[in-house]
UniProtKB/Swiss-Prot annotation:
Family (UniProt): Belongs to the complement C6/C7/C8/C9 (TC 1.C.39) family.
Alphabetical list of SMART domains matching this protein: MACPF
GO process annotations (BP): defense response by callose deposition; immune response; plant-type hypersensitive response; regulation of salicylic acid mediated signaling pathway; regulation of salicylic acid metabolic process; response to salt stress
Domain MACPF: 5-338
Gene: NSL1
GO cellular component: nucleus
Protein name: MACPF domain-containing protein NSL1
Alphabetic keyword roster: Hypersensitive response, Immunity, Innate immunity, Plant defense
Lineage of the organism: Eukaryota, Viridiplantae, Streptophyta, Embryophyta, Tracheophyta
Organism whose genome encodes this protein: Arabidopsis thaliana
Domain of life: Eukaryota
Length: 612
């Protein structure tokens, strides 16, 4: 039975639909909708249900659904107003999961939809300080299956990949989802969801007062429109109510979210209605239509992988599902996303970093940025990823004193199966750009400069063949009375792939300024901005579980950190769609610091059929 998100079901059809989705697959990255349920190719449930013990299932209000398995039960619901505590992002996400009979704090599709989030866990969690909601939940009834001895159908088990095959794993998830529906709650809900943004200074008590005020305002009872709550549970169609308000020909059971901001955008309200017939009328008018047009307001799930105990390949599917739920790439790009979810490592590896100086200072070129300032020595050794795609870069201050500048590359531990990289011997770096504007002093114009010319592939293969950075090194050249720092890159090619999309890191205006003017403008803009001492820094949510997620710590804090930005520049799985590679880079000077920016690209592998 097909179901469109904006189709209004009558009471009997809604009950039949609630029964029919029990045991179907579900993609937890989706909002709770009937349309997101998944069947087997022949339209069957994913789990085995005994067809020999069927009976008529009676619902509240006298609705009867025929030929329902005895393992499927129905319980009467209740009418409840719930106002949550003021919770953090992870606490609220965990609460939503618990309401769906799930554990953990990974945001679900329903959670993201209710609070109008972007599906990027770290960014969403970093953008808000607290979350809360206040609303009416009209549960007419709930339908559940007995979970004892719940078993997947053999045809579903046979499709579980026995190895890490990204295409097969992505196909399984797209076909069957990530979970199995074991419970459905039908009725309606009218809820205000509140997001306190990170920049807000309101205390939790103030947020609670605002929430109560907005809730009382939205859910107030108009004595003229007030109806008996008993009509909500009667389950009998009362068409006179719909006709009286002109709701019969129009209206939907699922309305779009209404998003409202406070004046300074510190607080956001997301108002959502599900079930009933919603034409933007008052809460009281909407309330009396819920029994005539109920919709799904909640579901309970069990993970598909929990029903695969002992089956070969369960671990691979479980890992793929966890990655999909954590980072939520578009389902149509899940194949490419999974291919790139290999361990990432830095070259050189942490254990290879020198504890002392590898070479004498005389053999390392140096840069001087002021008359009395320290020298910055430059490690000009070539860093090679071994024909493996580079996904990030960083500067690192090596040596016992932390005064040797080196470049490091983050790369995949292996090359994805769909890529076939080979080094391009025809590529030759551009020696020196003609435009003088690319040579930028770090402090004063009479001392060392940095070449900020973008380094990209310009080899003999000028077609759409994909070029990926696999090597990098630094070089120092004398130009007149000054020394200039250059970035050099080496590239590998894949003739079977093309570049689909490319973009650079955000470049600040300071990176285009030079010398004294950069320092002056930076100080002026700093004076006009809020005092850093009184401004609370925005905390970044890091879901990276690596031993050194922010890079190895030097033995001592180098003095030259005031001249070098050692921040890691990379795009990981949390950056949609999660399989970016580095295809270019450039040096920058920002606020008196040498930094590096990367150019990222998405690749598309061309099938052999399309090449014929």
């Amino acid at each position: 039975m097909a179901f469109n998100n904006f189709t209004r079901l009558d009471a009997h059809s809604a009950a039949e639909k609630a029964v029919s989705v029990i045991g179907l697959g579900y993609d937890l990255c989706s909002d709770v909708r009937f349309s997101a349920c998944k069947t087997t190719p022949d339209g069957s449930r994913l789990v085995e249900i005994d067809p020999t013990r069927n009976r008529d299932l009676i619902f509240p209000g006298g609705i009867v659904v025929n030929n329902v398995s005895s393992s499927i039960k129905c319980d009467k619901g209740e009418r409840t107003r719930l106002r949550s505590d003021i919770l953090s992002f992870n606490q609220m996400s965990e609460k939503f999961n618990q309401d769906m009979c799930l554990s953990g704090k990974i945001p679900s599709g329903m959670f993201n939809n209710m609070f109008a989030f972007s599906k990027c866990w770290p960014k969403d969690a970093s953008s808000v300080k607290t979350l809360a909601y206040d609303g009416w939940f009209i549960s007419l009834y709930s339908v559940e299956i007995v979970r004892k001895q719940l078993t997947l159908r053999d045809e579903v088990k046979r499709e579980v990949p026995s190895s890490w095959d990204s295409a097969a794993l992505a196909g399984f998830i797209e076909k069957y989802g990530t979970h199995v529906v074991v419970g459905v709650t039908m009725g309606g809900k009218d809820v205000i969801h509140v997001k306190q943004m990170r920049k807000s200074n309101h205390e939790p008590e103030e947020i609670q007062k605002m929430l109560k005020h907005w809730g009382d305002e939205r859910f107030c009872v108009d004595p003229v429109e007030s109806k008996s709550p008993a009509s909500v549970y009667s389950g009998k169609p009362k068409e006179e109510n719909l006709l009286q308000w002109g709701l019969q020909p129009f209206g939907t059971s699922v309305s779009s979210a209404v998003v409202m901001h406070t004046k300074n955008e510190e607080i956001m309200r997301v108002c959502i209605r599900r079930g009933g017939v919603d034409l933007g009328q008052s809460h009281e008018r909407w309330l009396s239509t819920v029994s005539q047009a109920p919709n799904v307001i909640s579901m309970c799930f069990v993970p598909i992988t929990s029903l695969l105990s002992g089956l070969p390949g369960t671990g691979f599917l479980s890992h793929a599902v966890n990655l999909y739920l954590r980072y939520k790439p578009p389902i149509e790009e899940l194949h490419q996303f999974l291919e790139f979810q290999l361990p990432r490592q830095w070259a050189p590896v942490y254990g290879d970093l020198p504890l002392g100086l590898r070479r004498s200072k005389q053999s390392s070129p140096s840069l001087q940025f002021s008359l009395m300032g320290p020298k910055l020595y430059v490690n000009t050794s070539k860093v090679d990823s071994g024909e493996r795609p580079v996904t990030g870069l960083r500067f690192f201050l090596e040596g016992k004193k932390g005064n040797h500048l080196a470049i490091h590359l983050q790369h995949l531990s292996a090359c994805p199966p769909s890529l076939h990289l080979s080094h391009d011997d025809t590529y030759e770096p551009i020696e020196e750009p003609v435009e003088k504007g690319y040579y930028v002093p770090v402090k004063w114009g009479i001392f060392s400069h940095v070449c900020t010319y973008p380094v990209q592939y310009n080899g003999a293969r000028s077609d759409d063949t994909a070029s990926i950075v696999t090597k990098a090194w630094l070089e120092v050249k004398g130009m007149g009375m000054r020394k200039v720092l250059f970035l050099r890159l080496g590239f590998s090619l894949d003739a079977s792939a093309v570049t689909r999309k490319s973009c650079w890191d955000n470049l600040s205006t300071n990176s285009r300024k030079s010398g004294v003017f950069s320092m002056i403008s930076t100080r002026l803009s700093t004076g006009l901005s809020p005092n850093p001492a009184t401004t609370k820094p925005q905390s970044k949510i890091d879901i990276n579980s690596a031993v050194y997620p922010r890079g190895p710590s030097p033995p001592v804090k180098p003095k030259l950190l005031s001249l070098v930005d050692t921040k890691e520049v990379m795009r990981g799985p949390e950056e949609q769609p999660g399989y970016w590679v580095v295809t270019g880079a450039k040096l920058c000077v920002e606020a008196g610091k040498i930094s590096i920016k990367a150019k990222y690209s998405l690749l598309t592998v061309i099938s052999e059929d399309s090449l014929v």
